[in-house]
């Protein structure tokens, strides 16, 4: 008698297992324990039957075993109600990325409130009792507020709990900020269209970075459904073209931040459309949109005078004309990236510096035509400059950096890699004039010596703020520089010493035993050393070193 109720339940489960050849309950549990993700197509056919088995939990006692086998009719009614409820729920189910779905036993079944008792046989509604209590005691507004703190995955899981929670979890107010980068392989057009309709006017920020399956049709639906969007990241959405920008221009007049990094089909026409309909743009990233020319940038600058950040890394067709238009029409510009815009000259940097005094981030790396005149203009007109990247500006000398250090005292990060003409004099000027300096790259600056590092180490910036120093391929740097840095720099976190031929293994090892090293317990020193090779002839008297690198 004790096990008669369980026997009938097991019979029912066996019927379920063979019905239409569906996957067995045991297989479902195995999927859960192995961490498999279930897509909508895999998941929905099974959950209707799965709840027959799992929405009930039995525990037994000799004194009340009769509760197992009485009221069979009521038991059947409960099962039928459960099935009907979930059938209706999944008819209304939204399509979501498969990464958002969980195995049924996790997404739908909660056993956490089951308390084992030494007496009493009960048939317990485990999850639905909990849900009913939550819905009864917490008003809808409070539940919405709680759900608003969840990420995308958690919201999708909550949407699978019940019909009531589906409505709450998918309420547009919970989807104001969405980042689908983690699901980029699963996100296709129907997902974006569904999100667009669901969120509507609530959506403010959306990141589709890396979602390469997204095309113009989906983005047109998004633009039409979400007119209040303010920030949109389409980086690496390679199917996006000018059509998307035309839709944004027509429907999304509140757009302020747009990232089109590595969207190769974007042309000048896209910028002209944006300048007409998205005049509130403040930040735009056009990096590696290699079809852009001066015409598109001029149209954008004229139509979007509030621009504060313009990133055009790798836009090799841009010339001085584009930069002068930005300077003329966007005086509030604060950040500009001209990496590999090789046609830019000192004349463009001069006008940019004069007209945009609020600049705090400037990248002119690989602009090989620039000279010290550009640094002098930045020093004279941009006192708020805090980040300067000028990799491979091979015409820059100590004189330019001396002027910069004298007037730009807020500098925090400088990348001077491959500025091959600078010497220790630059370090002396930076040490005296830039007390906030946190990160400095001097890689491939082959004229830097231990004396320059010593002067830098003795400066206030090194003592209090310097955290990262990169000295890759500085052939005149020796172990003495390590001693200077370790003794004086109290916040140093990382030193790069790759291919510094005069740095020795013993110098690196000595760091562990220096008395003052205890104040830098987390410092990382990155270096590698060339292995010794056999001499080319038997009579050779010196060991030879190759440039091949062995990681330390």
Task: Name each model-derived stretch.
Residues 130-142, 150-157, 170, 183-187, ...:
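Short amphipathic alpha-helical molecular recognition features
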Residues 283-294, 298-320, 324-328, 334, ...:
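Internal metal/ion-chelating core segments
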Residues 163, 173, 201, 224-227, ...:
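Inter-repeat linker/turn residues at the boundaries of leucine-rich repeats
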